[in-house]
Amino acid sequence: MRTLLLSTGLAALVAAVGPAMAEDPSTDPAADPTQLPPVTVLATRSETRTDEAPATVTVFTARQIEAMLATDIKDLIRFEPGVSVVSQPSRFGAALGTTGRAGNEGFTIRGLGGDRVLMVVDGVRVPDGFVFGAQSVGRGGYADLDLMKSVEILRGPASALYGSDGVAGAVAFTTKDPADLLRSGESFGARARVGYNSADEGVTTSAMVAGRGGAFSGLLAWTGRDSRETGTQGSVGGVGSARTMANPQETRSDAVLLKAVWDIAPGHSLRAGYDWFESDTTADVLSGRSASVLELLADDETRRHGWNLGWRGDRVLGLDRAQASVYAQQAETRQFTFEDRNPAVDRTRDNSFDNEVVGFAADAVKTLGVHRLTIGGDVSETTQQGVRDGTVPPMGETFPTSAFPKTDYALAGLFVQDEIGLLDGALKIIPAIRWDSYDLSTADDPLFPGARADQSGDHVSPKLGVVWQATRTVQLFGNWAEGFKAPTPSQVNQFFSNPAFGYVSRPNPDLSPETSRSLEIGARLREVDLFGGRFSGQLAGFRSDYEDFISQQVVSGAFTPADPAVYQFVNFTDVEISGVEAKADLWWDNGLSARFAAAYAEGETTSDGVTTALPTIDPLKVVLGLGYDEPAGRFGGQAIVTWSQAKDAADTDGLGCFNADPALGCAVGDDFALLDLTAYWNVDDRVTARVGLFNVFDETYSWWSDVRGVAATSAVLDAYTQPGRNVGLSLALRY
């Protein structure tokens, strides 16, 4: 299957190059991208202004990422209500407990996260998350922001254009191209940057070079980061479970990007890329020490590398545009833990989770009168395997072993979208539909002791978007979409047996896909005269219904050796979420600007006939900003206030927090307000210095996404707090 995918994809690319070279050269010069308004490709698979998209999309450009002094995805969404990233403190164990082991776990969009949010890097899916026992693998640590040209976040189902996993939303990372470093008419460009963040004593160093010669251009980029543990506001040190200071930790990461572009003819190009990411984190988990555990050490490694070959042609074969790509990616995570015990024998855990994928994708655009058709498809095959190893295994087990068998996971899909322009383009109706198939094929695996099962199925995902430019300044939009998520290999075939303690976990080949239906309706104002400046804003409301959510449940048994409890992943939960989001910008010709953003949502989950509040939704969050950019562009800055409401205690029912007094329930945090300051100085046209002062008033606070599930009576709540007052610095040089 892999050989077939690669050979078919390469053949398609080669076939496309010939017609491209025969096309008439285009006389339209490329527009300067710095003069264009923010655009999204994620929303409609074609470049669309974010204020003309039928759904809410946020685009972070490389310049914005640098201006925020963001070093990871949690920094990236710092000022983005409605989106969060779970990142708990490292307080895990060797055989039990996963708190903080996954690092930045991934994005949560409008209350749902994990594998329910599609994440791609240059169109290639980020590997699944995985949790089993003390092993926990997140999805937010596979890419380095310094290498990104843009990051797009789409709210709402994305399956009609992108297939499985786009149940709650999608996030697309796009890496830099040679043209991003090369100024018009120049044949060479370079950039170097150093940065520092006191929150984790992190030092970032990056270097990029790009060159152009004739029809060829290339890019070589590298970023290295060294950091320690992210600080907390906890004051209890020492060893043991009462510790609230962050456990000592050191992280080293390196990322490399190579790109080569051949401009075959004007508007037609062939490009090849290779990217490599590596991260190594060592931790001394002092909070895990006790009278019986003398030392707890961890070493976690993440590796991802991939290559891609793509072709794009404008006005080829009678089409407005066509593009195709073939790609391969390998991702490996390894989590090693050593536990020095007394009097028990020392033990280790050496767990891995590996993903290898190859794929091919293509799409084309054709305008026919008032119709702008986009049609395309993609196919991929992922080989997924997880191995549990170490010493002193649990009673009844032998190492090495696997929680699920080695699985080939194939996805294929075809889609069509029609952008219909009516009323001289003032009204756009955008229907789309996609058919997807999925197939899980297991292989004989000597490390998997259970009975294995294969599974396959298909799904159809429609959507309908509408954008109406009612007046020059007023726009109405709406988007109805369905999403789906196919079961993962570990959900279908997870197996574990511990008869001595009376429980087992068994495969379930009858799992159905998770599905969603979402409606978003909103209004936009664009460049309205207000207070002597120009005002733009958006107000949107949404309602989403999710069915057949997959969760692990006890389906039978009595927790005895004779009648063990049987755990199984089943379609168990239905979810309803509704909310409202708003954002606005006001700016003046003298360089002053103001911004506002807010998001509020509520939801409920129904499991086995019992309805409770959905605890994964973030509480109300409001962001207010005031900025100044000197008209000549030499210097500027922002003051940003972020206010977050405490979680309603009634919304934590069903979280399962353990308390000495059950009436106290789960921790809900407090209302808090933060002030962050950022500033920049363009020393000249080649040197830019930036500084940020975050949490200016040294507020003690926790994000709900991090403290969720912790008991209200916990003595270590301060361990989940964010850093106090901290500084970020950056110096960039361009040539």
Range-by-range predicted roles:
Residues 25, 422-423, 427-429, 436, ...:
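Gram-negative outer-membrane beta-barrel transporters
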Residues 74, 78-125:
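Extracytoplasmic beta-strand/coil segments of soluble accessory domains associated
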Residues 107-108, 125-155:
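Short acidic/polar hinge/loop motifs at secondary-structure boundaries
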Residues 141-191, 734:
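A beta-strand signature from Gram-negative outer-membrane beta-barrel systems
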Residues 198-227, 237-281, 303-313, 421, ...:
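Transmembrane beta-barrel wall of Gram-negative outer-membrane proteins
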Residues 228, 319-339, 477-481, 510-570, ...:
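Membrane-embedded beta-barrel scaffold of Gram-negative outer-membrane proteins
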Residues 245-249, 283-287, 294-298, 335-337, ...:
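Outer-membrane beta-barrel domain signature, especially the mid-to-C-terminal portions
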Residues 247-249, 267-322, 330-355, 390, ...:
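Flexible loop and strand-edge segments within Gram-negative outer membrane beta-barrel domains
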